[in-house]
Amino acid sequence: MEGNLIKINKWLYPVSWIYGTGVWLRNKLFDWGIYKERKFDIPVISVGNITVGGTGKTPHTEYLIRLLQKDYKVAVLSRGYKRKSKGFVLARPDTSVQMIGDEPFQMKQKFPDIHMAVDRDRCHGIEQLCNSHIAPGTEVIILDDAFQHRYVKPGINILLVDYHRLICEDTLLPAGRMREPENGKSRAHIVIVTKCPKDITPMDLRVLSKQMELYPYQQLYFTTLTYGKLHPLFTAGNAVSLKEIEKDKHILLVTGIASPAKLIQDLSPYNEHIESLAFSDHHDFTARDMELIKKRFMKLPEGKRMIITTEKDSVRLAAHPLMDEMLKPYIYMLPIEVAFLQDQQELFNSNITDYVRKNSRNSNFS
């Protein structure tokens, strides 16, 4: 198996112990019933993690949307991280990325028929989505990044674990990157190890299964990332596959994601001239950032250069008022999807659709 990317600062263990005590107490207050969890009379599926950084929540949420939207009216509820608005917001055709955040905006653009809403208070958000006057016809709700939001008790709780940062090898913040102890995984009905190498062996998967130490009631799946064709962000040109990129093309990879190293690693086999310009996750591009992007691009060989960015970053770049017109023809967006390994897709799909079918009823809440 590949080496992991985990770096633990042992000097911060005392602070992690204090932090862990607070997290333990909070979870116990829910376990003891002092803090109340609400169960809603509508299928609710939660997707989330117990670590900071990217585990692939958005592509897995989008997978669920694709799976369910052909038979059900799907609503997705997110916190709307770094949005400029407050409270409950239901996305409309003219809703901006600033109002709901980059990932919700991305999902609404890709799936215009879903109800896409943001609300920090997930219980309130679900109530609004169950209101036929606000979000007509809602039949199933997907909670994006809600594994630790325990005020809602979902029917299916999906925990995502990054293959490169296994929770069994990590530790609590700030020494590590875990937001709660590993035993928090016990709340999950389904655990998915994400970002697995495409060529991972059956033996490695068996080792991983043992390392995860799941309970008998839990299901374990493995997924990998797949990349679609590059789409021009501002022009009407044709999409281009990664294999079609000329070998002498020089690429400026502009990202504002949690783990750009994995993306660089995945793109390297297609081109050896990749320069990375990495910003923080959900980065709000400033005027200085836009100038830096242009400056770095102009240093690449003329006639042999392009800019590649992620879907999540593309929605912020496309809406940026200071985007240089000269750069627009050279910017391409790289879509990402997930694929299940070991022929697990059919089993996963049936488990999700069976749950939704058996629990579909009037969307009242209690």
From Swiss-Prot:
A Pfam match: LpxK
One GO cellular component term noted in the UniProt record for this chain: plasma membrane
GO process annotations (BP): lipid A biosynthetic process; lipopolysaccharide core region biosynthetic process
EC number: 2.7.1.130
Pathway assigned in UniProt: Glycolipid biosynthesis; lipid IV(A) biosynthesis; lipid IV(A) from (3R)-3-hydroxytetradecanoyl-[acyl-carrier-protein] and UDP-N-acetyl-alpha-D-glucosamine: step 6/6
Record key words, sorted: ATP-binding, Kinase, Lipid A biosynthesis, Lipid biosynthesis, Lipid metabolism, Nucleotide-binding, Transferase
GO molecular function, one term: tetraacyldisaccharide 4'-kinase activity
Entries under InterPro entries matching the protein: LpxK, P-loop_NTPase
Entry binding sites for ATP: 51-58
Catalytic activity: a lipid A disaccharide + ATP = a lipid IVA + ADP + H(+)
Lineage: superkingdom: Bacteria
Function: Transfers the gamma-phosphate of ATP to the 4'-position of a tetraacyldisaccharide 1-phosphate intermediate (termed DS-1-P) to form tetraacyldisaccharide 1,4'-bis-phosphate (lipid IVA).
HAMAP family documented for this protein: LpxK (MF_00409)
Family membership noted in the UniProt record: Belongs to the LpxK family.
Name assigned to this protein: Tetraacyldisaccharide 4'-kinase
Native source species: Phocaeicola vulgatus (strain ATCC 8482 / DSM 1447 / JCM 5826 / CCUG 4940 / NBRC 14291 / NCTC 11154) (Bacteroides vulgatus)
Lineage of the species this protein comes from: Bacteria, Pseudomonadati, Bacteroidota, Bacteroidia, Bacteroidales
Gene for this chain: lpxK
